[in-house]
């Protein structure tokens, strides 16, 4: 059910975003407690503002009401992905070269399932990161297929 709702929502929101020159980052349909949430994360170069999120929310809400694909009551949320933006697509990794990222793996590489460091390169199949162990810099190559989750990591 969840993946069906996500697919239908993507079909409905894509033309809206293309018209406004916005990017779809992610869609989630999740139950939290008793409530269902349909969350649509959008962005653009230079960041997105609350007015743009509101416009997309109104237009998407109209489209969802027309086709009515969701049987249960839910809350629609349209927002920016935030500063710790998820890296979901290969293009996200290309756009994040030189940035600090956090990666969680399906299985360990060199004894670890989590890495945080600078994304050095991405060739479409392998993520190369530089990370620190105490004061020493190390490098790890991670096959894209082994990445469970990845996001921008903010450091202070």
Curated annotation (Swiss-Prot):
Q: Which portions of this protein are annotated as coiled-coil regions?
A: none
Concerning Pfam families, the annotation shows: DUF150_C, RimP_N
Protein location? Cytoplasm
Report keywords, A-Z: Cytoplasm, Ribosome biogenesis
Q: Name one GO cellular component term.
A: cytosol
* Any one Gene Ontology BP term: translation
Sequence similarity: Belongs to the RimP family.
- Cited PANTHER family: RIBOSOME MATURATION FACTOR RIMP
What job does this protein perform? Required for maturation of 30S ribosomal subunits.
Which named protein is this? Ribosome maturation factor RimP
What organism is the protein native to? Oceanobacillus iheyensis (strain DSM 14371 / CIP 107618 / JCM 11309 / KCTC 3954 / HTE831)
């Amino acid at each position: 059910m969840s993946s069906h709702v996500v697919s239908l929502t993507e079909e409905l929101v894509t033309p809206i975003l293309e018209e406004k020159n916005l990017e779809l980052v992610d869609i989630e349909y999740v139950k939290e407690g008793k409530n269902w949430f349909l969350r649509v994360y959008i962005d653009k170069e230079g960041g997105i503002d609350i007015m743009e999120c509101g416009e997309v929310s109104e237009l998407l809400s109209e489209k969802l009401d027309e086709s009515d694909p969701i049987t249960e009551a839910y809350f629609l949320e349209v927002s920016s992905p935030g500063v710790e933006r998820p890296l979901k697509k290969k293009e996200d990794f290309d756009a994040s070269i030189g940035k600090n990222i956090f990666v969680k793996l399906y299985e360990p590489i060199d004894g670890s399932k989590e890495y945080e460091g600078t994304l050095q390169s991405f060739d479409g199949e392998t993520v190369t990161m530089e990370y620190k162990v105490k004061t020493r810099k190390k490098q790890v190559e991670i096959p894209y297929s082994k990445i469970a989750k990845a996001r921008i990591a903010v450091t202070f």
